[in-house]
Amino acid sequence: MTNSFALALHGGAGTISPQSMTPEKEQEYRAALGQALAIGYAVLGRGGSALEAVELAVRSLEDCPLFNAGRGAVFTHEGHHEMDAAIMDGRIRAAGAVTGVRSVQNPIRAARLVMDKTEHVLLGYPGADALARQHGLPMQPPEYFFTQQRYDQLQEALAEGRMRLDHSEALETEAPLQEPAAFPNEDPKKKMGTVGAVALDVHGNLAAATSTGGMTNKQYSRIGDSPIIGAGTFADNRTCAISCTGHGEFFLRAVVAHDISCLMEYRGLSLSEACRIVVHDKLAPIGGEGGLVAVDAAGNVALPFNSEGMYRAYQTSADAAPFVAIYKE
């Protein structure tokens, strides 16, 4: 058992600046991040597991309509919601994930269910919802996930024949309105909407969890990096726990989360150096914008991003004061 414990979380990354939101909205984001941090950190403070801490922190963010996950999930091209989530236990490298769920209130709970109650790692679409329902997880009708802001974003995207990453400016396509391109060129002015958390508990165990609603106006059952173990989510007690946020296609191609772990394991790099290499030297040159939160086995925290901002927070037993930030410093 170690005396160290730490929790870090994020609520998305992208073109985020003081000019892009009102002071009131900024305070709402900071309060929501702080609340999720307090919930997860309280678990660690009483000797609870890293798994419980990251799950509860992510559930708090899923319940907040400000973030593109759970209740605040964006709309697909067809006007419904397809949510993804993943969780991983660094102690034994067990993992569970769901993709394309439409009814489960907290997708991260469904991901935990896959890990704990099945022999599988990734379940999707009606089958994943059915498993959640069978095990008594809270389910919600479509109107629970309706937010006016997200609906307005969908209407704008449909009218423009575009697809959006979270509640940002659109990704332009040359396809006709009735059939927008599945993977358009990236617009430099956007936000990537995902929530996630990583933790180290007093028992020396690491865990990671990630949840997202994906892209506004997405179709063809598009899946990003969030539910893919090793790309958007990863945890290994020997190295680190990682939760990513960004343009998922690039994070998938770069296998970001696992790459950071490998740099630490095979090259002996520190957490901060491994994160810097992947986020700034590997992702950025291929057009991958976004960031991540990470914690290592010693309780060191890293929150790198190559975008203009990232909703983020962390707290450690070594520095008990909570840290909450949005913009570049």
Segments predicted by a language model, with ranges:
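Alpha/propeptide regions of enzymes that mature by internal proteolysis
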Residues: 1-329
